Curated annotation (Swiss-Prot):
CDD domains: AAK_NAGK-C. Catalyzes the ATP-dependent phosphorylation of N-acetyl-L-glutamate. The lineage of its organism: Bacteria, Pseudomonadati, Pseudomonadota, Alphaproteobacteria, Hyphomicrobiales. This is Acetylglutamate kinase. Substrate binds at G72, G73, R94, N199. It comes from Bartonella henselae (strain ATCC 49882 / DSM 28221 / CCUG 30454 / Houston 1) (Rochalimaea henselae). It is found in: Cytoplasm.
Length: 301
């Protein structure tokens, strides 16, 4: 056997070893629900998008019930710019007026959602695109953001327009889909009882869905490896109390704070464990679920 044949044999042996070692994890998650929040750089990279779709297809084929929730901030900003719609910001947060929320719904529940559905379907599965309006799945209320002025230390409440937070989740439709061959792909748009449409932060939306489904795992695909310590080293596992302390001592800071707070709330609402992982790593979902070392920061109660 020459060097080329040896090399090919080694590759096949490694693939076989991975499949063999993955079996206990596949059995662990069989018939369980895994919610995956898809966002960040991975959404803008065609190769990563195809790898993600293949991961989701493999989960379904392994007897797992995946539910995908996606964001789309950069794509919304791009369409607003093309349409000549100027955004107004309060403390760095976009104010979503009536015209903008129409664009948000068009982009999130329309083009982005259907692109993800098509990617998963191309892998031989049946994905279906939905948002909070479908089947009265999610109802939202207007969200208010409280900020403290750094100079005066006066607390101020920001009105961000048609930005909402989920207050009711009906799992009926998702349970029906879990019993079928369908994979739900959810856009974070929902109605209010007031008849208005609200744009919801995708992380918060995913947390609410995972909590309502009492998911085995909630995975957040991000642009970072996970939660890092002050030396930049990945923290492999955290409890809620440990995460709270890391927020207090500012080890966890900036945009990671609301993400970790969403993780903690999901755990309190019945999710078994939450993982923050790097969506820029191809097949990170499989690495997290089907290997001993995982692929990010595991947060548990």
């Amino acid at each position: 056997m020459d060097d080329v044949e040896n090399g090919v044999a080694d590759v096949f042996e490694k693939q076989a070893a991975f499949l063999s070692s993955a079996l206990p994890y596949m059995q662990k998650y069989e018939n369980e629900t895994v919610v995956v929040k898809y966002g960040g750089h991975a959404m803008g990279d065609p190769a990563l998008g195809r790898a993600f779709a293949r991961d989701i297809a493999l989960l379904k084929q392994s007897g797992i019930n995946p539910v995908v929730v996606h964001g789309g901030g950069p794509q919304i900003a791009e369409i607003l710019m093309k349409m000549g719609i100027e955004s107004r910001f309060e403390n760095g947060l976009r104010v979503t007026d009536e015209r903008i929320v129409e664009v948000v719904e068009m982009v999130l529940a329309g083009s982005i959602n259907k692109e993800i559905v098509a990617l998963i379907n191309a892998e031989g599965e049946w994905a279906i695109g939905l948002c909070g309006k479908d089947g009265n799945m999610v109802f939202a209320e207007k969200a208010y953001k409280t900020v403290i002025d750094p100079d005066s230390h006066i607390e101020r409440v920001l009105d961000l327009g048609f930005v909402g937070e989920p207050v009711e989740v009906d799992r009926t439709l998702l349970d029906l889909l879990a019993c079928s061959e369908m994979i739900p792909v959810l856009a974070p748009v929902a109605p209010g009882r007031d008849g208005k449409t609200y744009n919801i932060n995708a992380d918060i939306f995913a947390g609410a869905i995972a909590g309502a489904l009492e998911a085995k795992r909630l995975l957040f695909l991000t642009d970072v490896p996970g939660v890092l310590d002050k030396k930049g080293k990945l923290l492999k596992e955290l409890t809620i109390s440990e995460a709270e302390n890391l927020i207090k001592n500012e080890t966890i800071s900036g945009g990671m704070i609301p993400k970790v707070e969403t993780c903690m709330k999901a755990l309190q609402n019945g999710v078994e464990a939450v993982v923050i992982l790097n969506g820029r790593t191809p097949h990170s979902v499989l690495l997290e679920l089907f290997t001993e070392q995982g692929a990010g920061t595991l947060i548990v109660s």
